[in-house]
Swiss-Prot record:
Pfam families found in the cross-reference section: Ribosomal_L5, Ribosomal_L5_C
Superkingdom of origin: Bacteria
Name of the protein: Large ribosomal subunit protein uL5
GO BP terms: translation
Source organism phylogeny: Bacteria, Bacillati, Cyanobacteriota, Cyanophyceae, Synechococcales
UniProt keyword annotation of rRNA-binding present: yes
Length: 179
């Protein structure tokens, strides 16, 4: 059973009851997932940007968008319009597919993994987790990468509070640490 079907058939009715909501449409749901990677070295190394775009496309199944500098910062040696990262916004079936792979396959492959930090909510029910290396995703092989790069994964929910967001992610299978 896919994560999307599990959400519709068992998680949504359970959350409706647990959160004491009156309408099925009030139940929090995952709106989108943003996968973002900042590349400081992209200003000087164009191969890093190309490799990063390919990795993001492999991991998410969707072409990455190049993010560019809004203004020049001399200290970082960047000029306005220079590529400084890449991002992918996932919605719909691709989002659920990515979340399922991230929660069930990628997170358990992190070294010394004891769960994700339950304090990484933003106050509005959205959750962000930073990944230190792309090798946790089974689609990426160690032989094909030029260097280890991390990424930020933000799960945007329709939850009104952090408690609702946490309840939703726990039901989806997100392994929160106990501390």
């Amino acid at each position: 059973m896919t994560l999307k079907n599990r959400y519709k058939e068992s998680i949504r009715p359970k959350l409706l009851k647990d959160l004491g909501l009156k309408n099925i449409h009030q139940v929090p749901k995952v709106v989108k997932v943003n996968v973002n990677r900042g590349l400081g070295e992209a200003a000087s190394n164009s191969k890093a940007l190309e490799a990063s775009l390919n990795e993001m496309a492999t991991i998410t199944g969707q072409k990455a968008l190049v993010t560019r500098a809004k203004k020049a910062i001399a200290g970082f040696k960047i000029r306005e319009g220079m590529p400084i990262g890449c991002t992918v916004t996932l919605r719909g079936d691709r989002m659920y597919s990515f979340l399922e792979r991230f929660i069930n396959l990628a997170l358990p492959r992190i070294r010394d993994f004891r769960g994700v930090n339950p304090k990484s909510f933003d106050g509005r029910g959205n959750y962000t987790v930073g990944v230190k290396e792309q090798l946790i995703f089974p689609e990426i092989s160690f032989d094909k990468i030029d260097s280890i790069r991390g990424m930020d994964i933000t799960i945007v929910t329709s939850a009104k509070s952090d408690q609702e967001g946490k309840a939703l992610l726990q039901e989806l299978g997100m392994p929160f640490s106990k501390n």
